[in-house]
């Protein structure tokens, strides 16, 4: 699975630790997600998407990215 978590997180100058604390996981989990070594639960993917969207776009919900835009599965992973 590919993600754009690292890109979005760095754009808003958020550390892995800050994101991890915001969604209730360890920094190691965020690192594994960013490096494609961990597939999140739907709930975790939703929490990360929500935090990153709000931090990046504020109240401009029209600009929000979907879970599918942040977490990209290849066909062989489905």
Report the location of each language-model feature.
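Short, charged recognition helix plus adjacent turn
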Residues: 56-78
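Hydrophobic micro-packing sites on short alpha-helices
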Residues: 45-52, 70
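Alpha-helical residues within the helix-turn-helix
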Residues: 10, 21, 50
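Short alpha-helical DNA-recognition segment
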Residues: 13-32, 63
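Short, conserved catalytic or interaction motifs in soluble domains
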Residues: 35
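A short, Lys/Arg-rich alpha-helix, primarily the initiator
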Residues: 1-11
């Amino acid at each position: 699975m590919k993600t754009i978590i690292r890109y979005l997180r760095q754009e808003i100058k958020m550390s892995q630790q800050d994101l991890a604390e915001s969604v209730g996981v360890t920094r190691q989990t965020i690192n594994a997600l960013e490096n494609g070594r961990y597939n999140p639960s739907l709930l975790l993917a939703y929490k990360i998407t929500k935090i990153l969207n709000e931090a990046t776009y504020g109240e401009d919900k029209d600009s929000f990215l979907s879970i599918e835009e942040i977490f990209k599965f290849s066909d062989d992973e489905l």
